[in-house]
């Protein structure tokens, strides 16, 4: 019993208020995961890891090893890239392939990345850190991790937490922006959907062609888009069904779990608790807001040139962010709330998957620009 009290006293000796703040942050993330069902597969391990990394007098070398293997450049950012295989296997590009014009909304919804890059530079961050912070607007955790790691950002922990937190908060962040930028009449616009058959050949060629095009125009994004498209090729080829199911479920879930706990390896209070973390969280929110606004405004612009009976519901532009499939569902539900007979899901899904591609390419482009001008 005396030894137990000695150990307790020894632990309390090494405890400080910064650790307690990190315990609180970890507790909040766990609460959001369990009570609010916000990205539980990520926020739960991140929250628990934040507590774990800030316990006094504890040796957690194994988490550092996981970080070296899974996220550091030493092993080529293994976890995010492998996770892209699982994400690619989950995505059905059919709605996009049946209406390729939807790609414009995926591109427009990356506006927040470049706007936030400018804002972060004004806040005093150097070009590499500004680019790493801006990529939070990709609404894509793996892309945020890889870009920040490749550019050697000093703020990797805050960027990772901001990226995944805002992905989880899409149902909270997007609706106010959509309502601010659209009228009730616009939100009630109905859009017809004509299902077009997409051939198996097209589905197989699409990931291959996208990878080649990316290599030509944004070579820095090839590793990102390549793993994403490889996962989709596994899904669409038709001869690897069991492997496709494994990638979608077992592989994606396992890597997500490891990724969450590994992110926490850089959430020690000495790295995380500073004013720049708050600034980064604020800039991340700005990136999400302007991504959403970019998609909506391009839809409103297109409407100026369309006949009255062919108008687009501007809300669909907001689904162009990469948070798949959360954003498409959020916008669809908003449409149903305004008009119970307004079914926007097939439009929003197509735009959402185009945003997945666009965000990865944007990540590669921003890395290319930084390397050219730094």
Segments and roles (model prediction):
Residues 85-90, 105-115, 119, 123-155, ...:
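Alpha-helical membrane segments and immediately flanking helix-loop junctions
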Residues 29, 52, 76-97, 231-234, ...:
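Hydrophobic transmembrane alpha-helices of secondary-active transporters
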Residues 165-239:
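Membrane-embedded hairpin module used as a gating/binding unit in multi-pass transport
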Residues 1-14, 20, 176-205, 239-245, ...:
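Intrinsically disordered, low-complexity non-transmembrane regions of multi-pass membrane transporters
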Residues 95-117, 269-296, 348, 352:
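Entry/N-cap segments of selected transmembrane alpha helices
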Residues 1-63:
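N-terminal alpha-helical transmembrane segments of multi-pass membrane transport
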Residues 210-299:
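Transmembrane helical segments that form the transport core of multi-pass membrane transport proteins
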Residues 155-172, 281-291, 315-319:
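Alpha-helical transmembrane segments
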């Amino acid at each position: 019993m005396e030894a137990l009290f000695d150990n307790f006293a020894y632990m309390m000796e090494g405890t400080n208020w910064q650790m307690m703040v990190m315990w609180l942050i970890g507790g909040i993330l766990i609460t959001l995961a369990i009570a609010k069902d916000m990205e539980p597969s990520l926020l739960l391990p991140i929250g628990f890891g934040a507590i774990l990394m800030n316990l006094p007098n504890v040796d957690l070398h194994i988490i550092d090893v996981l970080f070296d293997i899974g996220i550091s450049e030493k092993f080529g950012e293994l976890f995010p890239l492998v996770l892209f295989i699982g994400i690619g296997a989950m995505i059905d590009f059919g709605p996009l392939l049946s209406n390729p014009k939807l790609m414009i909304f995926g591109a427009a919804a990356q506006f927040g990345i470049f706007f936030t890059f400018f804002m972060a530079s004004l806040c005093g961050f150097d070009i590499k850190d500004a680019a790493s912070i801006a990529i939070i607007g990709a609404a894509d955790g793996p892309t945020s991790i890889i870009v920040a790691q490749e550019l050697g950002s000093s703020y990797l922990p805050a960027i990772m937490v901001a990226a995944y937190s805002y992905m989880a908060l899409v149902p909270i962040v997007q609706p106010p922006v959509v309502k601010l930028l659209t009228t009730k009449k616009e939100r009630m616009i109905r859009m017809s959907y004509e299902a077009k058959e997409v051939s198996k050949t097209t589905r197989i060629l699409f990931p291959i062609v996208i990878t080649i095009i990316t290599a030509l125009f944004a070579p820095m994004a090839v590793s990102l888009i390549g793993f994403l498209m490889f996962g989709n090729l596994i899904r669409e080829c038709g001869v690897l069904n069991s492997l496709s199911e494994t990638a979608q479920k077992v592989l994606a879930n396992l890597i997500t779990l490891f990724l969450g706990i590994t992110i926490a390896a850089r959430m020690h209070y000495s790295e995380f608790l500073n004013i720049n973390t708050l600034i980064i969280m604020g800039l991340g929110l700005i990136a999400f807001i302007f991504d959403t606004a970019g998609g909506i405004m391009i839809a409103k612009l297109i409407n100026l040139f369309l006949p009255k009976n062919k108008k687009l519901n501007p809300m669909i532009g907001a689904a162009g962010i990469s948070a798949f499939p959360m954003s498409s569902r959020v916008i669809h539900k908003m449409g149903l709330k305004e008009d119970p007979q307004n079914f926007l899901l097939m439009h929003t899904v197509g735009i959402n998957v185009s945003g997945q591609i666009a965000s990865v390419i944007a990540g590669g482009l921003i890395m290319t620009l930084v390397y050219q001008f730094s």
